[in-house]
């Protein structure tokens, strides 16, 4: 394990003081793509995960040219401090964080507690569009060491040399349901990847949306045999919830070798010849 990096988290107080600083850009990324327009942190820009943080033609993360265009149009260059936040305890803020790290952005942080905490504290919200002077952004070569692909997951299952963490709900893990309530059922089969441990993503957070303490998180994962000594692969349904768990293990606990399998259950659950476990 490496030393943890608490500088990847900022408080709501910090954001209130620095949101409009030169060199800082606050970005909201929500599950509910209408939330930003209903009110957001003054000075923030909004990214739509369904159109701006994925390849809309090929199932994949955002292509590098689209990422560069998105960041540049958001007033972000390579030296900008990006502060991400969103609803649902920062589900898609973590998804954006993971992709930004893949493309090598150095200073990217998450506002602890997300939109939930900001609103609960009665802080200001704005419906005004943020003024963003267009900048030039140049992404680095994609760091695929942060991402697990199907062959690696298949090898991990066969060799049993990596820990698999299923971050979905218990009902998804057991196969009782195929997707969270209200979301499309995109899989043919229910269950989980053989050998995976069930550690639902929500257990990483307190009731106010903030992350649990280092000691609490370390104990929770250790109780399931996840200590960071062996490689870890996290997955969910499409990779967004598991990106939050990846963030916790990689940046809050300091695990050296942890990857997000964004193919997740929509890939594995539909794959011909792939084994599925059910209790």
Regions found by a protein language model. Give the residues of each.
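Cysteine-dependent PTP/DSP-like catalytic domain, specifically the C-terminal lobe
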Residues: 256-279
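Helix-loop module immediately N-terminal to the HCX5R catalytic loop
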Residues: 51-82, 197-231
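A mid-sequence, solvent-exposed acidic-amphipathic segment
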Residues: 164-220
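Glycine-rich loop at the start of a catalytic domain that most often binds anionic cofactors/ligands
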Residues: 36-43, 97
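Short active-site oxyanion
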Residues: 21-25, 106-107, 161-162, 231, ...
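Thiolate-centered catalytic microenvironments shared by cysteine-dependent enzyme domains
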Residues: 61-159, 176-177, 191, 241-259, ...
